[in-house]
């Protein structure tokens, strides 16, 4: 064993060993308990960032720990390879998306290997591989045959720059999240999958996910948004038109004073026929932002249509307005407004001088003051005719029943969740396997023509998808008839919704999944990924699993038992103001900083001497130029140090602040472990440990060792508080370094401790532990070693240290037998000179005893 810890000498050799021995390759083995650990697959952007490193280190720690417990552990990796960034990069670099993507995969694969992640590389997949997406296409055709897929014209957010549809969440301040172009509304035909058919299952099964973060489950519940209410139909005055609204508060119905409709509603169009101002407003609404997160904060605007709806119970006429906060794709595209009891309706009514009629009493039974704001609490009805005096639930039922009886109402369960639009007008994605015959018949691509392969040798002009620009590509024949292929491609969430299942059988060519392999490995035991995926990816992931189950391909109801959402990685951010006042962000690596005595940054300059503004810690990003290249850190400190810092600096689910001083601290710790091991081995062979002959000090040290094993086992396995596990090993190492090494049993105890420390650190720092295990004479490779077991006997304390107080002041510390009674402790305390002198001539009025810890004698 060399004297100095030099990761550059160790890590590449250990990685080569793993590669040659195929250490992490697994197959199904019914004789062993399986464990499937999965981190969300990366997009091959070209370089790993620290967010990747954190995600994959967490997954690797869990995988290695579970393997040491004797389980058959699957930890695969692959590439979420389709997507818009590849098209932009291809245009910029004058290439095609495919070679750019494959080059990035190769580069990032090598980066992952440098970090020592224990993947089964034989299971690697890239979602742009036709052997992968052929089964996605096949499954889509089966969903179509089951009636779960349909095509309809839909209003979408359209980015005129990227020429693609954007999800509501991708519209920021009315602009495209990627290129900042103003977004337009456009009607185009799109393919949808009926996720709404599974809304109740998706909602109810959240209760079975006991090991998922509550935050994620709450976000999904809100996204599904199940509500019970009533569809109410209004007649339109002077017309045969009908107007239907959905409400969850029929108890407030007698307070409805206007109806608001979406810009795309037929009544809006009708009102605009002879009203140019309304037509202009409708056009403005069509092109306005519709991201739901911004709905609550944006300015509420409206315009009257000139039409009136007739209240079906009171017979009163209420005006119909077009409002920018009503969306055609949600519910019926119309809402009844009760401004006295809904804040949004109140703001709109106040702005435009519409009536506000309270119909629910305040909680104290008084009439509510609705001049300053709406009264939104539920309560007793008044001002509601025959329904006066009813409480919320009775009012809800009575008004709903009356509407149903009159034929103008229908009780209904509604969902916020909308069907999944899977069409994208981009090139770099899996072609949607549908064709249109000459007679207009639309049908799935026949199975024997799958996969519909995306041509990869293309020229990108940055404007039109190559498969849309080339009329020849779309031409095909089905049953001898000419047909045209669909030129839209799948939303890339399609690929990432089932990749976890394909990992169980990536080479299987007889079907989408090998049921035997899939049902051996699934569900995933541990999934690791960011909280930002809570409602999109993780919802589709769960939905797809239920589709696979209903197709007979998997047996389980849910795809993953346990979910860990790691926090973001933050770094210092610096900028200076450019010539036009814009912020020019400077990499932290180039910032020369001065700190105060508490380590806070007080001044920063760039290499040219420009003064920099310190913008604090923020998420590592290209936009703020504050990403830290993992490769640079690995080359400087070694992969084990980077991994250890990532797991120690913060609890896994919290944000992590990147501090190079912390990385240096992790490196120093590994050097200490190496140094202690080296010094121990330099003293020669070690005798077997004889537990029966240990001194009290040796027993105490061994007790600390086995308590640490118990704590680290619980911290990694159950609590997943990896940082506290590492802290416990560090604390133990401090004790080991201070322990005497004079006798044979001192050295035998240190040998036991070091072999345990190496195994406890192995999931975090596998390379150095591999080397130390060999040097210390561990059996076989540490990769196949068993996790250390805490010795219950060793943890039993023969004695306890009890603090003795008199009137609350510490007077002595005494050692007593671990099972000593209170009387024995009091007797022992009375023997102490420092205690006895305070008891002389006084009466003990009260005794406070905390067993094994504290004795407080209150005297007077």
Swiss-Prot record:
Cellular compartments per GO CC: cytosol
EC number: 6.1.1.4
Enzyme kind, highest EC tier: ligase
One Pfam family from the record: tRNA-synt_1_2
Location relative to the cell: Cytoplasm
Gene3D superfamilies named in the record: 2.20.28.290, 3.10.20.590, HUPs, Isoleucyl-tRNA Synthetase, Domain 1, Valyl/Leucyl/Isoleucyl-tRNA synthetase, editing domain
GO terms, molecular function: aminoacyl-tRNA deacylase activity; ATP binding; leucine-tRNA ligase activity
Family: Belongs to the class-I aminoacyl-tRNA synthetase family.
NCBIfam families xref list: leuS_bact
PANTHER family in alphabetical order: LEUCINE--TRNA LIGASE, MITOCHONDRIAL, LEUCYL-TRNA SYNTHETASE
Name of the protein in question: Leucine--tRNA ligase
Encoding gene, per UniProt annotation: leuS
């Amino acid at each position: 064993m060399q004297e100095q810890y030099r990761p550059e000498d160790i890590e590449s050799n250990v990685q080569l060993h793993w590669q040659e021995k195929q250490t992490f390759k697994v197959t199904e083995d019914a004789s062993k308990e399986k464990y499937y650990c999965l981190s969300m697959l990366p997009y091959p952007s070209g370089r790993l960032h620290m967010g990747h490193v954190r995600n994959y280190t967490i997954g690797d720690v869990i995988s290695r720990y579970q393997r040491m417990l004797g389980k058959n552990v699957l930890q695969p990796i692959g590439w979420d390879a389709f997507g818009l960034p590849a098209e932009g990069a291809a245009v910029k670099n004058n290439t095609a998306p495919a070679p750019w993507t494959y080059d990035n995969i190769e580069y990032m694969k090598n980066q992952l290997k440098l970090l020592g992640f224990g993947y089964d590389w034989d299971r690697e997949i890239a979602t742009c591989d036709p052997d992968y997406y052929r089964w996605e296409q096949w499954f889509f055709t089966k969903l179509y045959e089951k009636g779960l897929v349909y095509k309809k014209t839909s209003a979408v957010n359209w980015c005129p720059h990227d020429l693609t549809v954007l999800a509501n969440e991708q519209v920021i301040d009315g602009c495209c999240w990627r290129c900042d172009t103003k977004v337009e509304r456009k009607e185009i035909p799109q393919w949808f999958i009926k996720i709404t058919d599974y809304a109740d299952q998706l909602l109810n099964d959240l209760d079975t996910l006991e090991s998922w973060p509550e935050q994620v489950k709450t976000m999904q519940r809100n996204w599904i948004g199940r509500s019970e209410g009533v569809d109410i139909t209004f007649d339109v005055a002077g017309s045969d038109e009908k107007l239907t609204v959905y409400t969850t508060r029929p108890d407030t119905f007698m307070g409805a004073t206007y109806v608001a409709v979406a810009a795309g509603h037929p009544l809006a169009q009708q009102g605009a026929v002879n009203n140019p101002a309304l037509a202009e407003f409708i056009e403005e609404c069509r092109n306005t932002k519709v991201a739901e997160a911004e709905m609550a904060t944006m300015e509420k605007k409206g315009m009257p249509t000139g039409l009136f709806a007739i209240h079906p119970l009171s017979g009163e006429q209420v005006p119909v307005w077009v409002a920018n906060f009503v969306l055609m794709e949600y519910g019926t595209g119309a809402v009844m407004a009760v401004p006295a009891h809904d804040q949004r309706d109140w703001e709109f009514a106040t702005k435009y001088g519409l009536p506000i009629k309270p119909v629910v009493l305040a909680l104290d039974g008084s009439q509510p003051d609705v001049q300053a704001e709406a009264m939104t609490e539920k309560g007793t009805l008044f001002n509601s005719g025959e329904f006066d005096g009813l409480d919320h639930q009775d009012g809800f039922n009575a008004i709903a029943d009356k509407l149903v009886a009159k034929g103008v109402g229908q009780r209904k369960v509604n969902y916020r969740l909308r069907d999944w639009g899977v069409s994208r007008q981009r090139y770099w994605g899996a072609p949607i396997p549908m064709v249109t015959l000459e007679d207009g018949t639309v049908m799935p691509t026949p199975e024997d023509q799958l996969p519909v392969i995306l041509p990869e040798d293309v020229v990108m002009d940055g404007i039109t998808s190559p498969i849309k620009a080339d009329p020849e590509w779309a031409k095909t024949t089905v049953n001898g008839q000419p047909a045209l292929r669909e030129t839209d491609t799948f939303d890339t969430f399609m690929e990432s919704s089932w990749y976890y299942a394909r990992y169980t059988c990536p080479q299987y060519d007889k079907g989408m999944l090998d049921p035997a392999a899939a049902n051996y490995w699934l569900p995933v035991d541990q999934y690791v990924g960011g909280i930002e995926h809570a409602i999109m990816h993780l919802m589709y992931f769960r939905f797809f699993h239920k589709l696979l189950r209903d197709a007979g391909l998997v047996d389980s109801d849910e795809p993953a038992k346990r979910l860990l959402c790691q926090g973001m990685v933050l770094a210092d951010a610096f900028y200076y103001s450019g010539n036009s006042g814009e912020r020019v962000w400077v990499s932290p690596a180039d910032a020369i900083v001065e700190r105060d005595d508490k380590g806070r940054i007080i001044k920063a300059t760039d290499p040219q001497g420009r003064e920099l503004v310190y913008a604090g810690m923020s998420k590592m990003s290209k936009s703020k130029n504050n990403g830290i290249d993992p490769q640079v850190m690995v080359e400087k400190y070694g992969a084990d140090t980077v991994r250890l810092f990532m797991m120690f600096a913060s609890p896994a689910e919290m944000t992590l602040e990147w501090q190079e001083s912390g990385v240096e601290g992790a490196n120093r710790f590994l050097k200490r472990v190496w140094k202690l091991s080296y010094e121990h081995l330099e003293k020669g062979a070690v005798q077997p440990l004889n537990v029966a002959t240990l001194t009290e000090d040796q027993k105490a040290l061994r007790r600390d060792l086995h308590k640490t094993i118990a704590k680290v086992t619980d911290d990694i396995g159950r609590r997943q508080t990896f940082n506290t596990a590492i802290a416990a090993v560090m604390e133990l190492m401090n004790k080991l370094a201070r322990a005497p090494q004079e006798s044979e049993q001192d050295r035998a105890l240190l040998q036991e401790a070091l072999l345990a420390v190496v195994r406890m650190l192995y999931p975090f720092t596998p390379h150095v532990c591999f080397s130390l295990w060999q040097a210390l004479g561990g059996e076989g490779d540490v990769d196949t070693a068993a996790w250390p077991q805490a010795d219950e006997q060793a943890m039993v304390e023969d004695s306890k240290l009890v603090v003795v107080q008199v009137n609350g002041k510490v007077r002595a510390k005494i050692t007593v037998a671990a099972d000593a009674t209170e009387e024995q402790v009091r007797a022992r305390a009375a023997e102490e000179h420092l205690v006895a002198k305070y008891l002389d001539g006084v009466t003990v009025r009260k005794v406070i005893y905390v067993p094994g810890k504290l004795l407080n004698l209150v005297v007077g």
